[in-house]
Amino acid sequence: MLPRKLKIDSTELAEITNELVQFLNCLVLRSGGLKKEHIWVRNGRILDERTVFFEEKTMADVQIDCEGLILSPGFIDLQLNGGFGIDFSTYNSDDKEYQEGLALVAKQLLAHGVTSFSPTVITSSPETYHKILPLLKPSNASSEGAGNLGAHLEGPFISADKRGCHPEQLVITSLSPNPVEIIEHVYGSTENIAIVTMAPELEGAQEAIEYFVSTGTTVSVGHSSAKLGPGEMAVLSGAKMITHLFNAMQSYHHRDPGLIGLLTSSKLTPDHPLYYGIISDGIHTHDSALRIAYHTNSAGLVLVTDAIAALGMSDGVHKLGTQTIHVKGLEAKLDGTNTTAGSVASMPYCIRHLMKATGCPIEFALQSATHKPATLLGVSDEKGTLDVGRLADFVLIDKNVTVKATFCSGKRVFLAQD
């Protein structure tokens, strides 16, 4: 039987289950760049076309014409505070309400091409963590929304001087005398935690980093007054990331470059790699700083949005945890201050801006929102690439990174309306 030939706007694409599907006429994002290839999918995963041809000796049940679009892995956002009116740091004593808000954000992210994210909780009280964290169980992407990679806890173990918009009264500036006991008291279980941002100069921080690493949690250094030395010690202890590079840390100084100096540290080795999140929205990070990061350590660059509840909403007053935020255009400011308080930029916007600011090729920008964050979190065997065996979570975009359609496990879950 000949394959059924469909366009990306066919209603059938939202219902496909165990059929053999071939995506044609697309530019596929590979490690070596964009390649004019086909993608084969069945039962939600990417197949090896050699298996189809030489072992199964079969034809596709369905062929989908991708109309020359770029087929990229779904975008991965490792720092997302909320969006669409929902703030992940706000808990109103109602588990169902919180879960409904989380589900709403996950659903809306599909229109942005985001298929996996880490819901981010800023500095909060132990009571809040104990209520929220059990509700942030990891999940895969589906027609219901983007997958949850586990929580990114940004605080409370940070520098009071570099707290940014985090509530000062909840910041914890020492993990002494018993870091593990303090962590367990503050967070409760670490089961649903994917990333912890902490300041490496705090007393007890190195032991805390080693503990987090032993639990499989990724440690990111940030919101910190640290000089380079404590940052390097953190990397040697297992920290793998810098949180929103250039923001909430010491400025670069030629005698002690602080955490920014980690980008060129001699301590970085294949055994101790380092990634850094960067907010490419034209507000948090000047284009010149983006270029410095890109040309200094391009391999570690990971795009994050740091978006807040105002993402996808109109200008006005919004919340970030217990803090009040004023949003105008792409700028979000803490009430009564000039402190930048998260972003309202989408991931496609950040990808476009990185290309514009640095002149990097689209392949690099896309890898920085797909393969690199997946590798950082250790989930690249399932997500972040279009290699054989991976989940068929991908996005069809044009050269301007306009999202045309999003697929999760091979099913179309979002279609842009012309």
Swiss-Prot record:
GO molecular function terms listed in the Swiss-Prot or TrEMBL record: metal ion binding; N-acetylglucosamine-6-phosphate deacetylase activity
Domain of life: Eukaryota
Pfam families from the UniProt entry: Amidohydro_1
Cofactor note: Binds 1 divalent metal cation per subunit.
Residues involved in a divalent metal cation binding: 154, 223, 244
EC number in record: 3.5.1.25
InterPro entries (alphabetical): Amidohydro-rel (IPR006680), GlcNAc_6-P_deAcase (IPR003764), Metal-dep_hydrolase_composite (IPR011059), Metal_Hydrolase (IPR032466)
Location of the active site: 306
Catalytic activity: N-acetyl-D-glucosamine 6-phosphate + H2O = D-glucosamine 6-phosphate + acetate
Cofactor field: a divalent metal cation
SUPFAM superfamilies from the UniProt entry: Composite domain of metallo-dependent hydrolases, Metallo-dependent hydrolases
Binding locations of substrate: 165-166, 247-248, 255, 281-284, 340-342
GO terms, biological process: N-acetylglucosamine catabolic process
Keyword annotations of the record: Carbohydrate metabolism, Hydrolase, Metal-binding
Family recorded in the similarity comment: Belongs to the metallo-dependent hydrolases superfamily. NagA family.
PANTHER family assigned: N-ACETYLGLUCOSAMINE-6-PHOSPHATE DEACETYLASE (PTHR11113:SF14)
Name of the protein described by the UniProt record: N-acetylglucosamine-6-phosphate deacetylase
